[in-house]
Amino acid sequence: MLTRKQFELLKFINERLKEAGVPPSFDEMKDALDLRSKSGIHRLITALEERGFIRRLPNRARAIEVIKLPDLGGNSGARRGFTPSVIEGNLGKVRPPSPQHAEDDSDRNVAVPVMGRIAAGTPIEALQTRSHTISVPPDMLGSGEHYALEVRGDSMMDAGILDGDMALIQRNESADTGDIVVALIDEEEATLKRFRRRGASIALEPANSAYEVRILPPNRVRIQGKLIGLYRKY
């Protein structure tokens, strides 16, 4: 499923290709969608490419090919399990402890800063400002420094990571193949994906067949942490 802006941009590009034989410029796209900056267009283009609707052709200016148009039929897809631990219930709160251990449990919990939102879908601008904290049992964290990000999007749903989940992240600048990571792309966009190496390149894999794998050179990707657990609100 596309957002309204993604659909509008895809429609505009497709119509321009049919009329003129060349795609519109980023300035024309920005004006057509009434956006303030071209960075918003860049994010929409990336989303359409990830989902397999368009392809950017290398070494050619303004080279965008429309591969398909939206299929209005739905496909929910199977949701498979996710191995890191999940605390379910009220967001940011563990289950009430028994009265005799209430004080001890409260003292043991760790306050983890929430640093903003992370995209499980379209890469979104990375936020570096702490907004609040959530209380996490220490045995869920292990060693190192940790932070939390609110998940936006559905590209990791088949790994059990859902829109609205709070992702618990261990700060790390490296990752092993198969890790689910916070990846910063081009120093401005953050996304939550499964990390793999493909030869000299890095693959950022979604866990949703509606999205495409992104293959990027290492100099465009910086690992900012690894997923170790989830908070989920019902």
UniProtKB/Swiss-Prot annotation:
It catalyses: Hydrolysis of Ala-|-Gly bond in repressor LexA. The keyword Magnesium does not apply. Homodimer. It comes from Rhodopseudomonas palustris (strain HaA2). InterPro entries: LexA, LexA-like, LexA/Signal_pep-like_sf, LexA_DNA-bd_dom, LexA_repressor, Peptidase_S24_LexA, Peptidase_S24_S26A/B/C, WH-like_DNA-bd_sf. HAMAP family: LexA (MF_00015). This is LexA repressor. Coiled coil: none annotated. GO terms for biological process: DNA repair; DNA replication; negative regulation of DNA-templated transcription; proteolysis; SOS response. SUPFAM superfamilies: LexA/Signal peptidase (SSF51306), Winged helix' DNA-binding domain (SSF46785). Residues 80-107 are annotated as: Disordered. Disulfide bonds: none annotated. Gene3D superfamilies: Umud Fragment, subunit A, Winged helix-like DNA-binding domain superfamily/Winged helix DNA-binding domain.
